[in-house]
């Protein structure tokens, strides 16, 4: 038998262990406050991003750049040098390249001289405006510079999306790419960049004859200039050579005559 004092202590212990309705209300209230605080924080981040977007857009500092040149004109090296300078100055930037350029088999941009930087992939059907908007919201900061390599492979719509990023966020978007393909026809992305870019710069390089290169000639395994084929065929020095217009025309004629002679010889035997 418990004494009266022991029974009283036992009842107090039981009451202490048993959660009261008041304690449950406090716990539920705390959980509700935590959930509510999380939602408020998300809204605050969203409106902060919108305010940052509005403030930057009002300043109107962003520009769309198109820097074009033939293959081997150091376009990629210039982009990577620009990225290095941003890092030195603690400036925010983002590098991007098309998934079609899989020569490195990795999400890096690498130049012929060996320097490289990590980058984000650009897929054929990607909405670049929505991607960059999500990237800015995810990192809680608007990148001051977006650097795009192989910009000639972008669609007309994607170039429009990049221009919208410039206008809405005040971001500087710098596109590096080719002007024309191996048949001297302007790429879709390049044409749209010529139409929309605020600043257009030519990166010049020299043909073996001393003139300025303007044609990205495609060559076969024998070094002959190719005149037919798909517009897009990824390759380096083994498939392309930058030529001036005169040398390109001369080599096309030489290649055509040589191929015609070989065809004639093979059928006359």
Residue spans of the language-model regions?
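Cationic, low-complexity basic patches in intrinsically disordered or flexible, solvent-exposed regions
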Residues: 10, 18, 52-54
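Cationic, amphipathic, low-complexity segments that mediate targeting or membrane/lipid association
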Residues: 36-37, 41-44
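Conserved P-loop NTPase "ATPase switch" module shared by AAA+ and STAND
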Residues: 141-154
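Conserved P-loop
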Residues: 59-135, 181-192, 205, 234-264
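Ser/Thr-rich, low-complexity intrinsically disordered segments
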Residues: 1-14, 38
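Aromatic (phenylalanine/tyrosine) cluster motif
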Residues: 16, 46-47, 54-55
């Amino acid at each position: 038998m418990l004494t009266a004092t022991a029974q009283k202590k036992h009842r107090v212990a039981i009451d202490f262990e048993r959660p009261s309705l008041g304690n449950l209300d406090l716990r539920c209230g705390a959980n509700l406050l935590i959930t509510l605080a999380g939602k408020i924080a998300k809204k605050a981040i969203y409106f902060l991003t919108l305010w940052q977007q509005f403030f930057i857009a009002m300043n109107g500092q962003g520009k769309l750049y198109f820097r074009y040149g033939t293959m081997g004109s150091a376009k990629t090296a210039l982009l990577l040098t620009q990225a290095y300078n941003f890092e030195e100055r603690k400036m925010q930037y983002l590098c991007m390249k098309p998934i079609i350029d899989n020569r490195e088999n990795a999400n890096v941009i690498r130049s012929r001289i060996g320097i490289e930087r990590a980058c984000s992939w650009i897929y054929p059907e990607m909405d670049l405006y929505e991607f960059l908007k999500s990237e800015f919201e995810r990192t809680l900061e608007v990148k001051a510079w977006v650097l795009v390599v192989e910009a000639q492979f972008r669609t007309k719509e994607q170039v429009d999306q990049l221009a919208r990023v410039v206008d809405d966020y005040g971001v500087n978007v710098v596109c590096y790419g080719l002007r024309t393909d191996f048949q001297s026809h302007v790429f879709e992305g390049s044409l749209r960049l010529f139409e929309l870019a605020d600043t257009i710069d030519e990166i010049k390089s020299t043909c073996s004859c001393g003139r300025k290169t303007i044609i990205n000639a495609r060559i076969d395994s024998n070094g002959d200039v190719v005149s037919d084929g798909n517009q897009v065929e990824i390759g380096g020095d083994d498939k392309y050579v930058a030529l001036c217009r005169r040398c390109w025309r001369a080599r096309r004629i030489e290649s055509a005559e040589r191929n015609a002679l070989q065809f004639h010889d093979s059928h006359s035997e």
